[in-house]
Amino acid sequence: MQSLVIFILLVIFSTSTYAQQRPQESFNLNSWNVIVATGTFVSPQFEGSKHYRVLPLPFIRASKGNYFIQTEGPGLTANILNHSRLKLGPSLQFRSERDKDVKNSVLKKFKTINSSIEAGGFLSYSIPVGAPGTNITTKIKAMFDLGDAHNGYTINSSITFNKVLNRRTRIGITLSTNFGDQNYNNTYYGLSAYNKIISGYSLYEAGSGFNDIGSSVNVTYSLKNNWGLIGIFGYKKLIGPAKNSPIIKNIGTRNQFLSSIGVSYRF
């Protein structure tokens, strides 16, 4: 898997270099399109949790032609390629801590896992299929811990079917999976000697591997005067090292849901 990570980084670097060598359009803020949205996001308190939390959902996207910069969950990503199908660029992401604020009484006693800032990049490619506005997009995104929260990396792979249903409604259906290296998986799914004493659960050292497989549906509906509605519903099943974790087996669940609803405005 380390070879795959190196390959991804080489592709990102080489493609970025190629993009910089191509003639670029002049930069003009007035020609950028901006979308802002706000709403609520419901997700598990931590990976594998039975309990959920409700968070605000701010979103902003600025685009010009094929270029864009946008928020993506608790992070930021940008496309640096002037290409209609191929997208590539850097990403930053915040991962929240797992501390004593969780609802489970056993997990409250575990050592806190600090929050982290992660950096990496993504690469995606879209293939038009059928009617205009319909495409299939494959995407891979690698993120690395910049601090000492887990000192590891994750790789998200996904494939999305996008379709314009009518002049107001768009839908996206995504299948995805997440891979974590040993450092990442052992931090969030492993059980140390200290936590074994606290909980009475078995010691567990999680190895690298795929941790989940999931799907989501994203629907956008355009209203009048540049307003719109956004709805997202997702589900994933924990597998591999995550499934075998004593934390998931004893106080968590393999079934993870998320949902979001928001209102958007296009400038």
Walk through the language-model features, giving the residues of each.
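Residues on the lipid-exposed face of transmembrane beta-strands in outer-membrane beta-barrel proteins
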Residues: 38-42, 58-64, 76-80, 121-125, ...
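Outer-membrane beta-barrel transmembrane domain signature
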Residues: 129, 146-228, 236-243, 249-250, ...
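Transmembrane beta-strands of outer-membrane beta-barrel proteins
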Residues: 32-38, 58, 69, 86-90, ...
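Residues that define the transmembrane beta-barrel architecture of outer-membrane proteins
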Residues: 32, 52-58, 84, 113-119, ...
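Flexible, solvent-exposed coil segments and beta strand-coil junctions
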Residues: 35-41, 98-104, 134-141, 192-201, ...
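Short loop/turn motifs that connect adjacent beta-strands in outer-membrane beta-barrel proteins
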Residues: 20-33, 48, 67-86, 128-136, ...
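Transmembrane beta-strand segments that form the barrel wall of outer-membrane beta-barrel proteins
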Residues: 36-44, 67-77, 104-108, 135-146
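Cleavable N-terminal export/targeting peptides
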Residues: 1-30, 252
